[in-house]
């Protein structure tokens, strides 16, 4: 499932990107010799008109080969005869279409309707405070309502989540949080959790300990716990929230626990031994909470505006992440390559068509931004070269261009090897 979802995703996104270059080239009457999805030997090849369309064996990218791109040809249909500003627009076509595709997909998703957890759209009323968390250390309590953080108005849990991500990516270490408690407004100084390292504020909405799903083969599944069960006690201790259940399971350190459960008006008890997650080292029993969801639908005009806004927000977050990688605030271990993308694609596809589309739109945006980085071989590097030629009023020396391409190839190969190693290490952890 993951491989098929990955191949479809890569195929669509590469087609979108290369089609942008293709259309821009046609706009300026440049002959396109080859339109390829993938690299290496072709497994499908067909010529229509003056262009050969092909699917190649290695599905990790694609290209359009333009007439006169690699050598100076004195022909009005050749890329080499075009003005620098025209070359810039042809190079810009791919990333531009990635951005437009992202906006279009988001608009269609918002029009069709997005299913989101209901609590994300609700006010930030604290239902649970994690032990030894940032929130507990500064005195946040259940029942507190967070209304503002660092000047950002917080109306919903979604607002709080986005604000914390922005602050973390901006490198803010401490900030002021405003909350309402018993009719009073309090302001607290908090440490901003580092989202890149997986840190959290340590609060959650009130989620009742009602079972929404059971992982197949898990300890809970083996003893017959079912969706709809209400967990009342763990080892004789009453619990009121899902997070208390999680905390008690983790505290068990693998020792047997007893659960008191309400099922269809009857009290039952189950005894089970929590399993240890080899990746995180924490104990679990394989239960998922029952989460209420709402479907958000918007008219197409409103959906389009929301799509543009969401694309802009994600672009800013991505640029901040890139800046964090350069300054060292974000670890390079967070980078993922084809293996990670295949895993994510498979998970999204299993979640449904809409989550898969959202994930595809997000990766399309990443692809567009990545290609605009002014590195040799990438579209951004070509745009930089053409801009320099425009300012100089004459082409750059061929030897410089060759050296520029070699440097770019070395950088891309190094980065590719790095993300592959990262992916493999992530699988082993």
Swiss-Prot record:
Its EC number is 3.4.24.-. SMART domains: PDZ. It is found in: Cell inner membrane. GO terms for molecular function: metal ion binding; metalloendopeptidase activity. The chain crosses the membrane at residues 88-110, 369-391, 406-428. Residues 189-265 form the PDZ domain. GO terms for biological process: proteolysis. Its main location: membrane. It is a multi-pass membrane protein. CDD domains: cpPDZ_EcRseP-like (cd23081), S2P-M50_PDZ_RseP-like (cd06163). Its cofactor is Zn(2+). The active site is at residue 18. The keyword Transcription regulation does not apply. Keywords: Cell inner membrane, Cell membrane, Hydrolase, Membrane, Metal-binding, Metalloprotease, Protease, Transmembrane, Transmembrane helix, Zinc. The keyword Signal does not apply. One of its GO terms (cellular component) is plasma membrane. Disulfide bonds: none annotated. Zn(2+) binds at residues 17, 21. Pfam families: PDZ_2, PDZ_6, Peptidase_M50. NCBIfam families: RIP metalloprotease RseP. Belongs to the peptidase M50B family. This is Putative zinc metalloprotease aq_1964.
């Amino acid at each position: 499932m993951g491989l098929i979802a990955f191949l479809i995703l890569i195929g669509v996104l590469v087609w979108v990107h290369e089609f942008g270059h293709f259309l821009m080239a046609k706009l300026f009457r440049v002959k396109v010799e080859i339109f390829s999805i993938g690299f290496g030997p072709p497994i499908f090849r067909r010529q229509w008109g003056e262009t050969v369309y092909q699917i190649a064996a290695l599905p990790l990218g694609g290209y359009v080969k333009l007439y006169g791109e690699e050598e100076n040809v004195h022909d009005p249909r050749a890329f080499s005869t075009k003005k620098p500003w025209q070359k810039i627009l042809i190079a810009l076509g791919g990333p531009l279409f990635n951005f437009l595709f992202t906006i279009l997909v988001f608009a269609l998703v918002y029009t069709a309707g997005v299913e989101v957890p209901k609590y994300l759209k609700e006010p930030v009323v604290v239902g649970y405070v994690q032990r030894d968390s940032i929130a507990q250390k500064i005195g946040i309590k259940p029942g507190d309502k967070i209304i503002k953080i660092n000047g950002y108005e917080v109306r919903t849990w979604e607002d709080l989540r986005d604000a914390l991500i922005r602050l973390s990516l901006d490198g803010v270490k401490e900030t002021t949080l405003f909350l309402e408690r018993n009719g009073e407004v309090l302001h607290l100084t908090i440490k901003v959790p580092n989202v890149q390292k997986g840190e959290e504020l340590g609060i959650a909405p009130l989620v009742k300990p009602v079972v929404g799903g059971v992982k197949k083969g898990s300890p809970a599944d083996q003893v017959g716990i079912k969706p709809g069960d209400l967990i009342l006690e763990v080892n004789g201790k009453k619990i009121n929230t899902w997070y208390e259940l999680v905390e008690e399971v983790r505290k068990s350190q693998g020792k047997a626990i007893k659960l008191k459960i309400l099922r269809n008006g009857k009290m039952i008890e189950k005894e089970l031994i929590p399993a240890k997650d080899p990746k995180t080292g924490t104990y679990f029993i394989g239960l998922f909470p029952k989460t209420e969801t709402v479907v958000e639908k918007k008219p197409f005009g409103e959906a389009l505006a929301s799509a543009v806004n969401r694309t802009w927000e994600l672009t800013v977050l991505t640029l901040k992440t890139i800046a964090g990688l350069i300054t060292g605030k974000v670890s390079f271990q967070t980078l993922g390559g084809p293996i990670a993308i295949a895993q994510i694609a498979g998970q999204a596809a299993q979640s449904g068509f809409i989550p898969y589309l959202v994930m595809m739109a997000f990766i399309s945006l990443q692809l567009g931004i990545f290609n605009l980085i002014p590195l040799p071989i990438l579209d951004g590097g070509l745009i930089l070269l053409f801009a320099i030629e425009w300012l100089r009023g004459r082409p750059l020396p061929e030897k410089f261009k060759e050296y520029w391409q070699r440097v770019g190839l070395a950088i891309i190969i190094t980065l590719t090897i790095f993300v592959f190693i990262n992916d493999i290490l992530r699988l082993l952890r």
